[in-house]
Amino acid sequence: YPPVKRVTAISFISTSFMLSGIIGQNLSEILSNAYGWRVTYIVLSVLYIILTFVVSKLVPESPYRNPDIKLSRFMSHFKDIFLYKSVIGCFFISLTLLTNFISMYTILNDYIKSHFVHGDLTTTFVVKLLGIIGMILSLFAGRISDKLSVIWVIKIALVAQIISLIGLGITSNIVIITFFSIVFVAGIAFCIPSVISKVGMLAATNRGFFLSVNTFILFLGTAIAPVLSIYLEKLTHYFVAFSILSLIALAALIVSFFIPKGINPDTAK
């Protein structure tokens, strides 16, 4: 893809796995409540088998191959990370995104069903599904980044996350909660492709390596989120839980101000 369309292309990819996160949660809850948790794993296994068959038949092989690549050579690139200090900032932002995304929905699920909101299982399903609106809006990230620059899209998206998390903690109105959840999801959905694009811009060499590391760190957040959620669910006030998540987003916002607007200044010499 040309650079102009790269952010848009990445937006489609990131939207797909965020979409699977929302649909997957709803599907698993429906199956678990109706048939038991074992059926959930059986259904998912069948879906993966079908998906494997579809991918093997319909997805073409990549025309770009390098059989000379060795694992030892790939691992040796880790020392280059410290040459790209701005990329480390992007890695930190990536770590916070899915951590907050999964943690927010875990807390939100409990919050809606609490005595503060008086929602039920159907209400949580609807609120989660409406979050898809925020994901669809992120498909315009490429066009917006062309107008504002990638780093400004990242900053605005992080601000949207902070405001929406605070908003979720101070209201018990289900309509307002739904609105803020959509804004939050949009902030995450805008931020992911923008950060990936920024990593590619900052890494003058070994872009594939740095993008691979960024992807690993991004999904590392999915492992951190359940652990974080356990502690957040023990808090007596939901406002405190949402505030902690907003502080994580605030830390990412502060880091974003140390990331240059253009290419890595260390490699532009």
Model-derived segments and their meaning:
Residues 60-90:
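Juxtamembrane intracellular "pre-TM" segments in multi-pass secondary transporters
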Residues 33-45, 231-249:
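A membrane-interface helix-boundary motif in multi-pass transporters
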Residues 137-149, 233:
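Helix-to-loop junctions at the C-terminal end of transmembrane segments
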Residues 1, 190-203:
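Intracellular juxtamembrane helix-capping segments at the cytosolic ends
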Residues 201-238:
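A late C-terminal transmembrane helix in Major Facilitator Superfamily
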Residues 149-195:
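C-terminal transmembrane helical hairpin of 12-TM major facilitator-type secondary transporters
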